[in-house]
Each structure stands twice: as C-alpha cells, then as structure tokens.
C-alpha cells in the first residue's frame, strides 16, 4: 500500500523523503526526517514510533543500516513492518518483515534507499533510485520528486494511489519543506505542483525565521512590510 524514497544530497547535506500510498495522509504516518541526522520510513502496517526510534538511534551514532537492524530486532510486531533509513553520511538500511503485504521490494544505493509493498512490479524501488541518481547536482526536492514519479511509471501500487508527501531537512531544526497531499485522485501530480510553488519561496521562509529584517516581502494584499 506504500512506496517511498529517502535520500541524502552529497553536496548540501540535505536529507529528505517522499512517499505515496492508496491510504489517506500517508506522509503524516510514514515519513520522518531530522536535520543533520537522516531520513526514515516506517510503512506497510505502520507504526510511526519506529521512524522516531530509527532517527534517535542514528543521532546517537548508530549507522542507518545498524539502526534498521536493531529496531527490526527489538520492535513488537516487527514482522508487519517495512523500514528504511538513510543517515547524514549516506549509509542506508532496509527491512521488510515476513508479513509485509503483497509484492514487496527494497533497493539501496549510497545515499538513497527505496521500498514498497503491494507493488504492481518488483522494479518500482530500483526505478526510484535510478531517477534519484540521474542528476546528482539537482536540488534534492527535484530528485525526490523524479524518483516518486518514476516509481509510479514503473507500476507503483497494485491499486490507485491517493496520498503523497515530501519532507526535507537542511541545517535548521525544523523541516524546510513539509508538503502533503492527503487525499486526491492524482496525489503525485498534485505534490509536484505544490513543490513547484514552494521551491522558489523556501529559502525566503527560512530567512523570515532567522533574520526577518532582511526577509523579502510576502507580496500579498495588505502587506506593507516584511
């Protein structure tokens, strides 16, 4: 019911994740990222706590592959979970429990990991990784969106997807991008549209938080200042 891609930009250190599902509000439950730490997915029959546990372990110094193995070994009902993680060093890990639904697969490259369940084709995660790797100089958000779209083209889920989301962290303590389409007939297309609106404004919103006196105007009716 879900396919996801988590990645790290080797040039900027940004980390992020995209995810799509036939279930509503998938990003609210499955996508996790933390600045300077990494990104993780807890999916299939989801326990959102596991994404937090993965990032806590990575922050404490555990490489992503070992963090995934430790959480999978210790978590109750781990056989129902599918987990992935990428850390700030580009180490990746993936796990699919024996009760992962339907056709399922994972794929890993240095700096990126993809996984899916109830897939229409085994090649979906590999297609996502290939698209993410195609332009290493591009913004991580563009690369993540390319990966998500490639996963859909490769078959995506067995059924139609209905939600999607993107989460990206940079140097700040908050996500610099947190976009969600919680229910739509074409959620990946809508997420792409949101990204194209958000991308040129994202840096300005960081400036408004850190140094509002130099931030650009909102350029909306009634805004006479910053």
What are these model-derived regions, one by one?
Residues 1-226:
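N-terminal nucleophile
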């Amino acid at each position: 019911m879900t396919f996801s891609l988590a990645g790290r930009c080797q040039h900027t250190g940004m980390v992020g994740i995209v995810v799509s599902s036939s279930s509503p509000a998938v990003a609210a439950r499955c996508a996790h990222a933390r600045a300077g730490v990494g990104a993780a997915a807890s999916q299939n029959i989801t326990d959102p706590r596991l994404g937090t546990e993965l990032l806590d372990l990575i922050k404490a110094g555990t490489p992503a592959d070992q963090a995934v193995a430790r959480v999978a070994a210790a978590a109750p009902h781990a056989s129902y979970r599918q987990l992935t993680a990428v850390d700030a060093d580009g180490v990746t890990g993936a796990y699919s429990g024996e009760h992962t639904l339907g056709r399922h697969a994972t794929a890993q490259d240095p700096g990126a990991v993809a996984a899916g369940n109830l897939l229409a084709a085994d090649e979906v995660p590999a297609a996502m990784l290939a698209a993410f790797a195609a332009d290493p100089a591009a913004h991580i958000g563009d690369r993540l969106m390319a990966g998500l779209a490639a996963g859909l083209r490769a078959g995506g889920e067995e059924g139609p997807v209905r939600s999607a989301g993107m989460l990206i962290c940079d140097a700040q303590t908050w996500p610099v991008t947190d976009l969600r389409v919680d229910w739509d007939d074409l959620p990946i297309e809508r997420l792409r549209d949101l990204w194209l609106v958000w991308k040129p404004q994202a840096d300005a919103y960081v400036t408004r938080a850190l140094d509002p006196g130099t931030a650009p105007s909102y350029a909306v009716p009634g805004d006479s200042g910053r």
